[in-house]
Amino acid sequence: MKKIDVKILDPRVGKEFPLPTYATSGSAGLDLRACLDDAVELAPGDTTLVPTGLAIHIADPSLAAMMLPRSGLGHKHGIVLGNLVGLIDSDYQGQLMISVWNRGQDNFTIQPGERIAQMIFVPVVQAEFNLVEDFDATDRGEGGFGHSGRQ
């Protein structure tokens, strides 16, 4: 298992609010919690930045972290990430902030300590462009959206 440096920025983390953990042995994502003083109510269409009380430093340029919505919040309540996916570069050292968007029809209240997003670690490959005049031909060619059909 890879070790990632984490800094607790809010003393409630690890006491009132549990540290991020994997829910099961097969979980890909660590749950991130809202490190709030008071509940925050989001009206339909509203967004807000929610602190986690944590900063990470991945340090390894072959890794990045991604913040993703929790499936139940998105499906049942319309609560997703305002930027859809949050990308954390290996050299970032600031607080993890979660952009929360209420795309649902009802007000939604985020409670202090509530699990509102998940974070996964993914491999990174930095590419170098090779300028060419043409590509080698493939069966697909320039076929784009819907090119391969629905069934």
UniProtKB/Swiss-Prot annotation:
Q: Which GO terms describe its molecular function?
A: dUTP diphosphatase activity; magnesium ion binding
Q: Does the keyword Magnesium apply?
A: yes
Q: Which GO terms describe its biological process?
A: dUMP biosynthetic process; dUTP catabolic process
Sites binding substrate sit at R70, S71, G72, N83, L87, I88, D89, M97
| PANTHER family documented for this protein | DEOXYURIDINE 5'-TRIPHOSPHATE NUCLEOTIDOHYDROLASE
Q: Which family does it belong to?
A: Belongs to the dUTPase family.
Q: Which cofactor does it need?
A: Mg(2+)
Q: Which reaction does it catalyse?
A: dUTP + H2O = dUMP + diphosphate + H(+)
The gene it comes from is dut
Q: One Pfam annotation, family name?
A: dUTPase
User: Mind telling me what this protein is named?
Assistant: Deoxyuridine 5'-triphosphate nucleotidohydrolase
Query: NCBIfam families from the entry?
Result: dut, PRK00601.1
Description of how the protein assembles with itself and partners: Homotrimer.
Q: Which Gene3D superfamilies match?
A: 2.70.40.10
Which CDD domains did the record assign? trimeric_dUTPase (cd07557)
**Entry EC no(s):** 3.6.1.23
- Highest taxon of the source? Bacteria
Q: Which pathway features in its UniProt record?
A: Pyrimidine metabolism; dUMP biosynthesis; dUMP from dCTP (dUTP route): step 2/2
Assigned keywords, A-Z: Hydrolase, Magnesium, Metal-binding, Nucleotide metabolism
Describe its function. This enzyme is involved in nucleotide metabolism: it produces dUMP, the immediate precursor of thymidine nucleotides and it decreases the intracellular concentration of dUTP so that uracil cannot be incorporated into DNA.
